[in-house]
Amino acid sequence: MPTIRQLIEHLDVTGEYCQFALDAEQFGDDLVQAWTGIENGAHLLWLAAAVGVEPKKIIATACDLLGEVFEQIETAGQETAQVLEAVHAWQRGERSADEVDRSGWDAYGLIARMGDRSPLAPDAEEVADAAVWLTSLVRDLPPSLSPDLAEHDQVLWCGSAWMMVDCLAQALASHQSPDDPPPGERQHAFEKAMCRFAILIREHIVGTEVQTAAQQRGAWPLC
């Protein structure tokens, strides 16, 4: 029976998630247990996307993560609120993916124009970055993560899911740590945020769902 480490290495065509594969080795060949035990939210959402969990469910989960962090960071700007509004409208069928994409470009353009002169606090800027990654998930939404989907497109889409969660964890770490924190304090806050996100993701997507998606895609068990 293949192991979870082998599954992640198989899905990780770019070699960017080697540490994740090593960390997952402790779970042996139990995918459901791995889903329950992994404490890094970015890795969880990437794995769910990579094995083929329903793409719109990935987006809904990501949107809820962004919404929760947005409510915690009082300096988060209007550009993030507009992205959330656009994605929620898209989920209701009231906006097109192109309109969501434009809201992301608007947010990105605002950040880029301000550059180093940005009045946004670091945590608010990281939330805005996460919002841009969320719009890319909508823009590049695949009909399904089937074996026929171009590998390049699949890598980008799953990577966007990982990046969005990573930006949110960076935002919370910045928000909860002073400008010049003691050694290790910001990293601790980052890891704590990732653990929190892992819990929230598991509230949306359960381990058996991930296992079934992987089996249907032919990614698990590996031949």
Segments and roles (model prediction):
Residues 1-223:
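Short, glycine-biased loop/turn motifs at secondary-structure junctions and
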